[in-house]
C-alpha cells in the first residue's frame, strides 16, 4: 500500500484539476454512502475529519448520540473517471470514529483491519480474491429498471448472444484505470448475467475493491441506459449471483494451500474453522431474504462440506498451482458487506487455527443431485433469513469476535427486514421496491 501524506493528497488535487471530493463509507449492510466537499475545503476536512449524523445511517447510532466522524484512508484516494474531466471528482474510503477519536463499533473497515492484524501477529499473511456476479437488465422508457435481461446468452457465450461484452470491456478498462486489476470477465450462466474477477490482494484492499467494483458497474451501466443488479436471485428461473471468496495463507513465504492439506495442518485447521462456523456466518454473507432462494441450485451450496474441484460444496480447493492455490468459499452473495463477510471468514479460520480444529474428510459427491447427501450427516446452511438470524444470535463465537453494538444493531435490522417482508401485502412488489431497485 502506498504511503501518502496530507500534502501529497493536496498536491494530487492541484495536479489533477480536482474540484469535488467524496468521503465514502458504508453502513453495516455494505450499502455505500458518501459526503462530498469542495476541493477548497479539503485541507480542513483532512485535518479534522468530516462530521455527520450517524442516526440517519442504518444500524449506526441513536438520535441522542448521533455524531460521528469520517477519517479518510489516504492511500485509497482515486479519481472517478466516469465523472467530468473538467472539475474532476476524487474519492477516499473512510473509517468511522466517534467525535473524541474513540473507535466506533460500526466501523466495518476497522473490524476487518483488526482481523488481518491478528493473522499477522501469528506470522501469517492472508490474500483474498473475489469473484463477483451480477445481472444487466433493460430500463423502461421512463428510465426505471425492468426484469428483462439485456440478452438470453449463457455461460461463456459471445456476441450476438452476449450483449454485455462491450459493457464488460468498459468496466474492466475503468477498473484498470483505478488500480483494481481485473483478471477475468465473461458471460455467466443466467440470461443477462455477467462475472468479473479481480486479482487477489490483502483483505482490506479486496473489500475496498468489491465496494469500488460495484460502484463502477452501476455507473457504467447507468451511463449506457442499463440497470445493474447485484440481487442474489433476481430471476427465479435463472442462476443466482454469488460473491465467491478465495483465500490463501502464507507462512514464511510458503502458500499453505499448496499441495496436500493435512487435516491438522494450519490450512486444514483454518478450513475446519470456516466450516464449523459457516452456519453462524450466513446472516452476514447472505443478508437478504432473497439470498436464500439461491442456495442448493445452479452451483450455490446447501450443505456444510468441502472437496477438491467439486462446485456443489460450500468450500472447494481448485486444482491449480503455486500462488493460485487457495480455498474458495462459495456461499457469499454480492449483497453482503464485504468488510464483515471477509473479516468474519478470517475470524472463523483463526478460531480453527487457535483451537487446532481438525478438517473433516472431503465429500466427493454431487450434492446438487437429489438424495446424494442422505446418510452423510451433513449440516445444512440456513434455509431462510429468519433461521440465519436465530442461529447467529445464539452464537458464542460471534458475540466474542464482533463489537457488541454492531452485532446488536445488525440482528435488530435483520429481524426488521424479515418482519417487513412478512407483513407486506405484495411481497414481490416489496422486494422490487426495496431490494431489486437498490441492491
Task: Go through each PLM region and give its residues.
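Glycine-rich, acidic/polar active-site loops that bind/position phosphate-bearing ligands
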Residues: 1-439
Amino acid at each position: 500500500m502506498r504511503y501518502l501524506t496530507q500534502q501529497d493528497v493536496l498536491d494530487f488535487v492541484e495536479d489533477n484539476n480536482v474540484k469535488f471530493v467524496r468521503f465514502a463509507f458504508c453502513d453495516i449492510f455494505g450499502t455505500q454512502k458518501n459526503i462530498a466537499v469542495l476541493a477548497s475545503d479539503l485541507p480542513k476536512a483532512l485535518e479534522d475529519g468530516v462530521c455527520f449524523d450517524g442516526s440517519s445511517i442504518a444500524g449506526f447510532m441513536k438520535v441522542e448520540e448521533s455524531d460521528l466522524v469520517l477519517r479518510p484512508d489516504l492511500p485509497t484516494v482515486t479519481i472517478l473517471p466516469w465523472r467530468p474531466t473538467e472539475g474532476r471528482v476524487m474519492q477516499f474510503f473512510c473509517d468511522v470514529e466517534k467525535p473524541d477519536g474513540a473507535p466506533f463499533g460500526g466501523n466495518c473497515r476497522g473490524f476487518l483491519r483488526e482481523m488481518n492484524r491478528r493473522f499477522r501477529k501469528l506470522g501469517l499473511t492472508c490474500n483474498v480474491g473475489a469473484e463477483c456476479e451480477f445481472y444487466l437488465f433493460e430500463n423502461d422508457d421512463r428510465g426505471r429498471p425492468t426484469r428483462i435481461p439485456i440478452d438470453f446468452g449463457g455461460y461463456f457465450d459471445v456476441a450476438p448472444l452476449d450483449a454485455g461484452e462491450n459493457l464488460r470491456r468498459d468496466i474492466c478498462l475503468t477498473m484498470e484505470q483505478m488500480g483494481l486489476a481485473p483478471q477475468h470477465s465473461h458471460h455467466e450462466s443466467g440470461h443477462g448475467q455477467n462475472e468479473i474477477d479481480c486479482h487477489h490482494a490483502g483483505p482490506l484492499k479486496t473489500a475496498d475493491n468489491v465496494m469500488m467494483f460495484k460502484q463502477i458497474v452501476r455507473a457504467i451501466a447507468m451511463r449506457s441506459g442499463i440497470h445493474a443488479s447485484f440481487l442474489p436471485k433476481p430471476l427465479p428461473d435463472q442462476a443466482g449471483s454469488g460473491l465467491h471468496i478465495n483465500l490463501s495463507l502464507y507462512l514464511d513465504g510458503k502458500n499453505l494451500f499448496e499441495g496436500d492439506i493435512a487435516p491438522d495442518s494450519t490450512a486444514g485447521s483454518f478450513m475446519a474453522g470456516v466450516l464449523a462456523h459457516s452456519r453462524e456466518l450466513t446472516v452476514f454473507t447472505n443478508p437478504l431474504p432473497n439470498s436464500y432462494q439461491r442456495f442448493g441450485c445452479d452451483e450455490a451450496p446447501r450443505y456444510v462440506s468441502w472437496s477438491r474441484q467439486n462446485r456443489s460444496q460450500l468450500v472447494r480447493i481448485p486444482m491449480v498451482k503455486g500462488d493460485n492455490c487457495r480455498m474458495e468459499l462459495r456461499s457469499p452473495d454480492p449483497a453482503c458487506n464485504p468488510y464483515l463477510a471477509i473479516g468474519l471468514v478470517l475470524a472463523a479460520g483463526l478460531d480453527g487455527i487457535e483451537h487446532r480444529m481438525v478438517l473433516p474428510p472431503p465429500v466427493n459427491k454431487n450434492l446438487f443431485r437429489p438424495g446424494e447427501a442422505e446418510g452423510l450427516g451433513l449440516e445444512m446452511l440456513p434455509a431462510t433469513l429468519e433461521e440465519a438470524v436465530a442461529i447467529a444470535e445464539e452464537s458464542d463465537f460471534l458475540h466474542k469476535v464482533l463489537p457488541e453494538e454492531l452485532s446488536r444493531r445488525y440482528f435488530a435490522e435483520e429481524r426488521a427486514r424479515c418482519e417487513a417482508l412478512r407483513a407486506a401485502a405484495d411481497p414481490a412488489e416489496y422486494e422490487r421496491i426495496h431490494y431489486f431497485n437498490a441492491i
